[in-house]
Amino acid sequence: MPITLDPEKLAIVMKHKFQYKICRECGARNPPDAEKCRRCRSRNLRPKKFKKK
């Protein structure tokens, strides 16, 4: 069953795949509310890029 047909499942997938931050220095994935990178302790974080089709 495709996930795109069920809006509840789609919301769960979108949350887990796109709601996090990426460190610009080491590329580590961090929680969406992070202020510092868990790996290198840098404050240079960006939200995960997402293009909607």
UniProtKB/Swiss-Prot annotation:
NCBIfam families: PRK04136.1 (NF003161). One of its GO terms (molecular function) is structural constituent of ribosome. The gene is rpl40e. GO terms for cellular component: ribonucleoprotein complex; ribosome. The keyword Lipid biosynthesis does not apply. It comes from the Archaea. Transmembrane segments: none annotated. HAMAP family: Ribosomal_eL40. Belongs to the eukaryotic ribosomal protein eL40 family. This is Large ribosomal subunit protein eL40. The keyword Ribosomal protein applies.
